Structures are given as structure tokens and as C-alpha cells.
């Protein structure tokens, strides 16, 4: 089990790094370096100013992160600054012998989960540094023979912790130390509330999933909220106790260490968390209804993420970018009003329904609300994401 879990985590780390490896400047390129007491920041000449700003604040961020996590790495960390895909991202490689961070300079769009921030370099450094400081804590006992033979020296927390905890904790740190990011934006509470209202908060077994739209956001958004809930329930400093227990002589596996600190298995406490989040969402919905809040009419229920909605200048069409599944972005355009084809299809459905209901043993079939509507046009993305900031041209016939 340990070997399979470790292989998965190593594979996942390398998979995340693949775009950077393929698209970024190679080792033979022109590299420049800023050095600080704990970091080496490597960059191509075109990123010199961005790297200089990062170097100016990296030691103060280091001091805050190490104090918050409760551990300070002994090795200097290499930081690589690049922008291979013109999108917001970062990577952390928590190897015990040579930890490294990769920072992509393009900032996120405002409507994304991490779109609420004050300084992109600060929040990106805080999140990725949290990974390093959190995960390079070594064992406080000698390594086993098999662990000494491992080609990738990883600490006990990296080997034992599930993905939701790894990403959730870095997300928690990014918010706690910057006052921005996912914990302070509107996207995270919106997702938690919507999932709660629909009874779709992921089960514990799916919390670390990498498949589906929820798999892309759940470890960050739901995982960080669960960790905040755990520490509020158990008391300040309880998460630091968990990290120490995982690296201790009697640490055991993750479930055993978690139970030693919080008193119950993670699955049981997560079920309690889900119940509370659902109850809070329903109570808030009822409160807003009593206050007379009108949310508007639901037009479509779509799988995955939908962003950048924009009505055409003539008011006849709706443009939006869609990410129905991770790395499956597209642009979609709908007719706002019901089309003649849709009207005929609805008439045929009603005629079939009326004919069936002539049989007294049949019961009427309630149609889906809102009725699903297919886009008039779609344009798949040619890369791993969706086009950024699509908008109508003035003629209302073309999209930029």
C-alpha cells in the first residue's frame, strides 16, 4: 500500500511538472540568479524585474511561513521563475536533499478561485513555500533500509498525507498570512454553499480525487475549509501537533496520527463537517428568502465551470467560456431566446406525452427544469485550458 501510494504521489508531482519542463527555457539558456540566506532565485533575463521583487520579499515570507507551520528547513531552496503558458500556476518539489519551487509569473484572472489577491508574487510564494516547509520535515528517527534506498528522498508527511491535506493546508496558509487568496475570496464560500445546498459536498473518499471538476478544486477549497474547521474545533496549534506526530517515532500511518491528535478518524470528522456545512448553507438560504432576496431565474445547469458570460451587443446571444472537465476548455455561444428548432422539439415531446397519458396506467413525466439547451456554436481550446477574457466584437458576429 505504501509503495503504491508513494508511486502515485511521485507520479502526480512529475505530471504537474511536465508542462513546465516541456515549455520553459532549458538549462542551456541564459540564467541569472538572486541569492538570499535561504533561497536561490533563478530566472531568464526577461523575468529579472519580477524575480527581483520576489527576492526582496522572500525572506520575510520565509519567516512568517516557518513560524506558522512550526518548522524551518535546513537546506537552501532553489526557486525558478518562468512563464511557459501565460497562465497562473506554481509548483513545489519537497525533496529532502534539494527542495525546489517553480513560479509562473502570469497572474490569475479575477473570476478564478484565486483571483482575490493583493500581490501575486507574495501569494504564490506563500503557497508554494508552505508546501516546502510543511513537507520537508524529516523523520525524527533513523530511516529504514528501504527508505534509504529510495531514489527520491521524501519526508514522512509527503509520504503519508492525502492530497486534500497537502493542498488544503497550503491554501489555508496562503490566506492566513496574506489576508487574501482562496480563503478570503468569494469563490470558496460560493462553492461550499452551492455544494451544500445540492447535497454534493464530496465524500471523504473523493476529497483527494484528481478526476472531474470537483477533483480540481475540492482539495484546495473543501480541504482548506475542513482544516480550518478542525483547528477551530480542537484548538489553535492542533495542526502543528499533527505534523509533529506524522514525523515522530510512533507516528504510524495518516489515520493513526490524525486520530491521536483529533480523537476520531478523519472520515468520521469529515462527515460531521459535511453535515455542518450543509446545515449552514440551508439555514443561510432560508434566511435570505425571508429577507426577500431575489436571486433571479435559473437559465441553465451546466457541468463543470462556466465563466466570463457576456451578452452580444444586439442582445440575442450569450457567450461564455466553459471548462466541463479539467483541461477541456471551450467557448460556447447560445441563442438566448428559444429557437424554432427547440420549439418544435418541445411540441413533439408534449404530443408524445399526451398520447402516452391516454393510457390510465401511465403517469405524467415532469420535464427537467431548466430545460437543457445545446450551444449554437462551440470552439474547443487548442491547449490545456480555455481562452482568457473572451468578448464580443462590436458587430455582434465575431468573438475576440
Residue spans of the language-model regions?
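Bacterial N-terminal signal peptides
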Residues: 9-23
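Juxtacatalytic substrate-recognition/specificity segment
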Residues: 24-162, 209-212, 253, 257
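Catalytic Zn2+-binding segment of zinc metalloproteases
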Residues: 129-145, 169-187
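Amphipathic alpha-helical substructures
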Residues: 154, 161, 184-284
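Multi-bladed beta-propeller domains
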Residues: 283-305, 334-391
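Blade-terminus and WD-like Trp-Asp/Gly-His loop motifs, strongest in beta-propeller folds
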Residues: 309-317, 389-398
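Short loop/turn segments immediately following the C-termini of beta-strands
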Residues: 323
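Structural motif
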Residues: 326-335
Amino acid at each position: 500500500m505504501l509503495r503504491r501510494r508513494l508511486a502515485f504521489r511521485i507520479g502526480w508531482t512529475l505530471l504537474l511538472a511536465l508542462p513546465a519542463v516541456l515549455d520553459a527555457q532549458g538549462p542551456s539558456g541564459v540564467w541569472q540568479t538572486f541569492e538570499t540566506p535561504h533561497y536561490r532565485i533563478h530566472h531568464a533575463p526577461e523575468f529579472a524585474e519580477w524575480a527581483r521583487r520576489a527576492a526582496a520579499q522572500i525572506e520575510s515570507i520565509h519567516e512568517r511561513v516557518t513560524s506558522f507551520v512550526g518548522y524551518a528547513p535546513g537546506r537552501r531552496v532553489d526557486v525558478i521563475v518562468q512563464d511557459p503558458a501565460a497562465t497562473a500556476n506554481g509548483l513545489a518539489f519537497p525533496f529532502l536533499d534539494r527542495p525546489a519551487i517553480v513560479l509562473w509569473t502570469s497572474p490569475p484572472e479575477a473570476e478564478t478561485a484565486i483571483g482575490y489577491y493583493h500581490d501575486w508574487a507574495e501569494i504564490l510564494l506563500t503557497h508554494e513555500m508552505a508546501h516546502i516547509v510543511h513537507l520537508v520535515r524529516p523523520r525524527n528517527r533513523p530511516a529504514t533500509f528501504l527508505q534509504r534506498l529510495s531514489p527520491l528522498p521524501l519526508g514522512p508527511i509527503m509520504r503519508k498525507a492525502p492530497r486534500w491535506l497537502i493542498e488544503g493546508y497550503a491554501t489555508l496558509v496562503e490566506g492566513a498570512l496574506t489576508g487574501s487568496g482562496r480563503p478570503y475570496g468569494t469563490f470558496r464560500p460560493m462553492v461550499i454553499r452551492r455544494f451544500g445546498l445540492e447535497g454534493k459536498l464530496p465524500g471523504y473518499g473523493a476529497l483527494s480525487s484528481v478526476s472531474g471538476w470537483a477533483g480540481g478544486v475540492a482539495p484546495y477549497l473543501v480541504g482548506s475549509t475542513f482544516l480550518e474547521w478542525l483547528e477551530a474545533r480542537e484548538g489553535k496549534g492542533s495542526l502543528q501537533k499533527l505534523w509533529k506526530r506524522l514525523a515522530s517515532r510512533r507516528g504510524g500511518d495518516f489515520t493513526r496520527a490524525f486520530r491521536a491528535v483529533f480523537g476520531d478518524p478523519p472520515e468520521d470528522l469529515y462527515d460531521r463537517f459535511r453535515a455542518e456545512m450543509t446545515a449552514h448553507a440551508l439555514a443561510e438560504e432560508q434566511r435570505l428568502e425571508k429577507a426577500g432576496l431575489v436571486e433571479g431565474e435559473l437559465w441553465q445547469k451546466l457541468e463543470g465551470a462556466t465563466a466570463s458570460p457576456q451578452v452580444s451587443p444586439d442582445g440575442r446571444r450569450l457567450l461564455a467560456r466553459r471548462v466541463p472537465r479539467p483541461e477541456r476548455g471551450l467557448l460556447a455561444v447560445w441563442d438566448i431566446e428559444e429557437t424554432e428548432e427547440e420549439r418544435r422539439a418541445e411540441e413533439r415531446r408534449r404530443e408524445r406525452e399526451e398520447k402516452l397519458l391516454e393510457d390510465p396506467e401511465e403517469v405524467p413525466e415532469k420535464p427537467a427544469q431548466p430545460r437543457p439547451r445545446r450551444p449554437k456554436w462551440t470552439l474547443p481550446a487548442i491547449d490545456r485550458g480555455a481562452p482568457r477574457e473572451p468578448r464580443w466584437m462590436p458587430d455582434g458576429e465575431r468573438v475576440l
